[in-house]
């Protein structure tokens, strides 16, 4: 199983729930239906994530952990934004920041630099170079 792909699925579920107000529990129930969304990628023929490579238990733990600690996670993000409000962040960037902030704060077995690097890679893939730099700066203040 692949942690990188698992993070990607978790980020996409977070994005989905942030975008359409769907309950995280519903999103987890529909995990088998996860498909690449044109709304979060610039490439229309982008490959979908193969769920056989995904650690579903890890994804569920991350999603549930973020849901249970969302206020604390968002406060941590807000405290590290400079000249930005959390409401102005793109939904993709917010999803990535929530995912990484959760890992930094609650997943002690994952080195901070790994979580930050994975967040930067997700930002490059789904949001762009400027977002990757922005996310790196925000997360760099947290560690």
From Swiss-Prot:
PANTHER family: ANTITERMINATION NUSB DOMAIN-CONTAINING PROTEIN (PTHR11078:SF3), N UTILIZATION SUBSTANCE PROTEIN B-RELATED (PTHR11078). One of its GO terms (biological process) is DNA-templated transcription termination. The keyword Nucleus does not apply. It comes from Clostridium botulinum (strain Hall / ATCC 3502 / NCTC 13319 / Type A). GO terms for molecular function: RNA binding. Keywords: RNA-binding, Transcription, Transcription antitermination, Transcription regulation. It holds the Pfam family NusB. Involved in transcription antitermination. Required for transcription of ribosomal RNA (rRNA) genes. Binds specifically to the boxA antiterminator sequence of the ribosomal RNA (rrn) operons. The keyword Amino-acid biosynthesis does not apply. GO terms for cellular component: cytosol. This is Transcription antitermination protein NusB. Belongs to the NusB family.
């Amino acid at each position: 199983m692949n942690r990188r792909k698992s993070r990607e699925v978790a980020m996409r579920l977070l994005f989905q729930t942030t975008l359409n107000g769907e309950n995280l529990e519903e999103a987890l129930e529909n995990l088998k239906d996860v498909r690449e969304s044109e709304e979060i990628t610039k490439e229309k023929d982008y490959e979908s994530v193969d769920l056989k490579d995904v650690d579903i238990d890890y994804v569920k733990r991350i999603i549930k952990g973020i849901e249970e600690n969302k206020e604390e996670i968002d406060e941590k993000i807000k405290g590290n934004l400079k000249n930005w409000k959390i409401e102005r962040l793109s939904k993709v960037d917010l999803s990535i920041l929530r995912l990484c902030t959760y890992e930094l704060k609650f997943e002690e077995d994952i080195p901070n630099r790994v979580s930050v690097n994975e967040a930067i890679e997700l930002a490059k893939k789904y949001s762009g170079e400027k977002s990757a730099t922005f996310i790196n700066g925000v997360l760099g203040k947290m560690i």
